[in-house]
Amino acid sequence: MSKVTEAFSNGKAFIPFLTAGDPNIEKTENYILELEKAGADLIEIGIPFSDPIAEGVVIQEADLRSLKAGTTTDKIFNMVASVRKKTDIPLVFMTYLNPVFHYGYETFFTKCEEVGINGIIIPDMPYEEKGELNDIARSHQVDVISLIAPTSEQRIQKIAADAEGFIYLVSSMGVTGVRSEIKT
């Protein structure tokens, strides 16, 4: 059983999200440790990206602040390595395919394994295109978290059957952010 799956041992999990490097990388490390103290079962760490198409204004602005502060993927890996000296809480990256592709799949997931990243969520990677990346991630003990958006029953069953770690349910169409209601 993976560390990500273990986070759901009580049937549900508290999973907060934060953008790495907002306002700076040192505070991100402190925030992760404080989130664990506050009861987090797993923490999503957003790797900032210049074009976060699935994100609403709050996370877009956090990404821009982080990038402006000089946050890089290497600095995030170093921060995670430091966090790992203090906690073993499951950590999952939330990022887009471009930064992972640019880093190189093998190099990226080797580094994830070295520093102790347990999973990854890539919202702009279609299920049908995750084959090569998924195989490399699995070889480095990194769960690729599947997303399920409103779709056909057959597609939901297919994605769910192949899921690892947990399933990220996209509850509404559009970008992330505050909603006055969620229509299902």
Label for each model-derived stretch:
Residues 1-17, 81-84:
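N-terminal amphipathic alpha-helix/helix-capping segment at the start of soluble metabolic enzymes
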Residues 14-28, 92-104, 143-151, 179:
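Active-site mouth loops of central-metabolism enzymes
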Residues 15, 41-44, 121, 146, ...:
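Conserved beta-strand positions in the central sheet of alpha/beta enzyme cores
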Residues 16, 35, 46, 112, ...:
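Conserved, mostly hydrophobic/aromatic
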Residues 39, 112-118, 138-144, 161-168:
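Glycine-enriched alpha-helix->loop->beta-strand junction motifs that scaffold or abut catalytic
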Residues 42-43, 47-49, 58-122:
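Active-site beta->alpha loop and helix N-cap motifs at the rims of alpha/beta catalytic domains
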Residues 59-62, 69, 157-184:
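Glycine/Thr-rich beta-alpha phosphate-binding loop at enzyme active sites
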Residues 68-71, 116-129, 143-151, 157, ...:
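Catalytic beta/alpha-barrel core
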